[in-house]
């Protein structure tokens, strides 16, 4: 039987494909020990509190040794003395421009058209309780509106109704003569 002939191959060179040399058992054991030793020594060295100071003081042999556990040596006043403290000087602001002052009419119109105030008043009408901050805002804004209306001479319609009722009561007293009927 004739077998086909094999083509001659080129000899392998060691530079083309390097062979992985298997490590012996002793070499593997040695590497494992080194790896284990490196893993064991993680973290900070013990006694670092004293070692840090000792490395700094190697240069200063004449300096006295300090114990890092002892705190500050700043003197503490045992008796309270009343000394007026100097107030820090406020830094001058770079030409703070005053806000343009609104006329009372403009300010009143602005406050009456305030969306936040309207929303808060709607919440009050719905029976909700407001936070302290919101209630303070409502009170301040309504007080300012009242002050502006007084300044401008604007009166609310509620006062007119009360005055009319008082006049009617007085007329009834004068005509009827008996003050107990009115009450």
Curated annotation (Swiss-Prot):
InterPro entries, per the entry: YihI
Residue span of region Disordered: 1-114
Transmembrane segments: none
One Pfam family from the record: YihI
GO aspect biological process, one term: ribosome biogenesis
Keywords linked to the UniProt accession: GTPase activation, Ribosome biogenesis
Annotated Basic and acidic residues bias: 25-34, 92-114
Keyword Transmembrane: no
Domain of life according to the entry: Bacteria
A molecular function GO annotation: GTPase activator activity
Annotated Low complexity bias: 1-18, 56-65
Family of the protein in this entry: Belongs to the YihI family.
Function, in words: A GTPase-activating protein (GAP) that modifies Der/EngA GTPase function. May play a role in ribosome biogenesis.
Subunit structure: Interacts with Der.
Protein name: Der GTPase-activating protein YihI
Native source species: Serratia proteamaculans (strain 568)
Gene name in the database record: yihI
